[in-house]
């Protein structure tokens, strides 16, 4: 007689000695364990190579589009910028500065291919021309001053919001309808509807203006030496970044909470979860090892897709708190009509989004083997 075995994840397994067929009379595909390891590894390698190729092409297209934007503008953008700099400063740019502007915005005496090669040369040398509003400061210098603050703010708050929202959503979906779920769900729904700038203004008014617990603007105390290995400087950064960070986390975690909760409500009724409970596993083992593990995958995918929205929220929050990141720099560039700075900031934000999506795609492929086999 054939022996029937049971699995906590899949219910009743196929009899070991019985030949099984599907509805069409064909033998089904062998399970993953029956596929030789070298074939599974080859499929995984192809998946990662395809994803790397996709994001390389995406980056190439984004850079090419950024190259074409000023070429579609009427007239000669480089000459217009040169005239504007002369009007603002009272002195014309130096020949080297004019050459830098020409490399980035085009030289009519060159063909498009020559301009494109010069553009790539400028990018590889991190040469984006000079800022119009802060002439003669190079755009790259301003980017390098603002980019670390934005990466610190966006990176820390995105991860923190994702972790908080995912864990709370898993707990609420594990026992839907309990007291915690009934009270917390309406509150988070209301919080999720708040615009980022409105919440930032409320937080600023309460904690910085009325209570005076935290600073109203800036990224660190100017009286503390700018040294990363200085404990007082680190504490100053945490103090000045607390209000922007709390605002972004409060805005961001609600989406992850509802996403995880909705998937968990469905997952807890799956057969493999019910069987795990029937086998006597503890609630924590079933929650973490079976239900939450499978419900987590949509949140991993959504993490990359949310980067664009997080950047948009960060721009508003940085502006409200005068936090010296890319958002505040973009607002200042728009106000001053500083096109070289605007164009470079948009390129950097696009690149950050692409990198975040790439990392999330790689993590998703490691968590779910089915994506590597598709």
Feature annotation, model-predicted:
Residues 65-72, 118-121, 187-218, 247-249, ...:
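Membrane-water interface segments at the C-terminal ends of transmembrane alpha-helices
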């Amino acid at each position: 007689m054939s022996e029937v075995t049971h699995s906590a994840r899949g219910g009743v397994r196929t009899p070991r000695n019985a030949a099984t067929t599907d509805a069409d009379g064909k033998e089904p595909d062998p399970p993953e364990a029956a596929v030789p390891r070298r074939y599974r590894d080859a499929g995984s390698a192809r998946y990662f190579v395809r994803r790397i190729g996709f994001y390389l092409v995406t980056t190439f297209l984004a850079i090419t589009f950024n190259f074409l934007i000023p070429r579609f503008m009427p007239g000669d953008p480089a000459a217009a910028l040169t005239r504007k700099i002369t009007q603002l400063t009272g002195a014309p740019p130096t020949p080297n500065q004019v050459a830098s502007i020409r490399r980035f915005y085009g030289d009519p005496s060159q063909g498009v291919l020559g301009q494109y090669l010069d553009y790539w040369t400028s990018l590889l040398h991190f040469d984006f021309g000079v800022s119009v509003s802060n002439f003669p400061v190079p755009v790259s210098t301003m980017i390098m001053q603002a980019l670390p603050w934005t990466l610190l703010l966006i990176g820390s708050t995105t991860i923190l919001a994702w972790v908080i929202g995912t864990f709370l959503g898993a707990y609420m979906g594990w026992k839907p309808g309990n007291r915690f779920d009934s009270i917390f769900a309406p509150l988070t729904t209301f919080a999720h509807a708040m615009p980022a700038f409105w919440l930032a203004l409320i937080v600023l008014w309460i904690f910085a203006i009325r209570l005076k617990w935290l600073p109203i603007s800036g990224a660190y105390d100017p009286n503390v030496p700018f040294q990363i290995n200085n404990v007082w400087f680190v504490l100053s950064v945490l103090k000045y970044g607390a209000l922007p960070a709390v605002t972004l986390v409060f805005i961001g975690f609600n989406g992850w909470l509802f996403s995880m909760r909705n998937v968990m409500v469905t997952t807890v009724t799956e057969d493999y979860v019910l069987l795990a409970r029937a086998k006597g596993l503890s609630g924590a083992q079933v929650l973490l090892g079976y239900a939450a593990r499978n419900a987590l995958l949509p949140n991993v995918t959504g993490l990359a897709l949310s980067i664009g929205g997080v950047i948009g929220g960060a721009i508003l929050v940085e502006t409200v708190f005068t936090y010296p990141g890319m958002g505040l720099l973009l607002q200042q560039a728009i106000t001053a009509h500083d096109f070289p700075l605007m164009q470079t900031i948009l390129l950097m934000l696009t690149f950050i989004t692409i990198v975040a999506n790439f990392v999330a795609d790689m993590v998703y492929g490691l968590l779910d083997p089915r994506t590597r086999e598709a």
